């Protein structure tokens, strides 16, 4: 990655002197372009998905609906409708509603262990969805059908080995998601996972987990990512339909306010600490004795939080909630994210992206 920073520094020095120089990849970059912002950023992720900015909104079950996904896509990113656990009619209605908000690319997420995964996979083809992200299983059974329909397939992975397997299956890109993220999590941090995955696969890698501002975006690009996925940052935007009480919990969270439940049962979930989470952790001390009670507690726990019961529900959130302090529109958030990222280090995200391309080209 030293090469990336070296090129970024060289170009910053040249641009501030209003000197033009051909980019090593053949891209002419002059002083005016330096200030045009993220709308000029082109990476393999933006090219693959046909989006303007390399920012994807994470699929949050019971939260990421047409209102949120449509707003993010319209703002230039990629909005994702979360289909996990949802009836097919709801999915159809949400995709159609999002299409009324935006004509830009739109995605949907499939949790492959869901009982209706096969029917959902076919429905998304019928609905002509642009992108499918996947989790909780292998997309092998649906890859051929999706690819034949022109759908871009992006699995979410928590390990390098899984990223390599997804590339072999034909995935167009992967989201490398660290344990800092909210919801279901793996073991590796984003800082450890992301460079390992970018070194191991040739397809584009999207960084996720612990990213909520320009610093996180710049860091992900420095580690080799060509885009980022964020969930927690979009929980408080105007277009997110969760209850105000949920949003206020995110806005007031401190860096030590999340907890991971479910590790003992093999289904770890990161959420904010509250009465419900503490009760779960206490019962998890003896799974053999309390397993049935835990199962009953989990039923409807996310729905309760989303609807406003923030004491007796699961408030899924990433650790990065500690840096989320304001309510804004999705467009305002995306514009702010890019401005912040490009203010760091005196270089544009385009320069970082191009430096990463050079690194791949040179085999570094």
Regions found by a protein language model. Name each.
Residues 1-38, 363-364:
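N-terminal amphipathic/basic-hydrophobic helices that include classical n-h-c signal peptides
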Residues 1-3, 7, 148, 304, ...:
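Residue-level detector of intrinsically disordered, flexible termini
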Residues 4, 12, 42-43, 65-67, ...:
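Generic signature of intrinsically disordered, low-complexity, basic-rich segments
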Residues 34-204:
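Active-site entrance/lid segments in N-terminal catalytic domains of soluble metabolic enzymes
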Residues 62, 77-88, 176-187, 211-244:
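Glycine-rich phosphate-binding active-site loops on the catalytic face of alpha/beta enzymes
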Residues 192-206, 212-364:
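Conserved active-site-proximal phosphate/metal-binding subdomains
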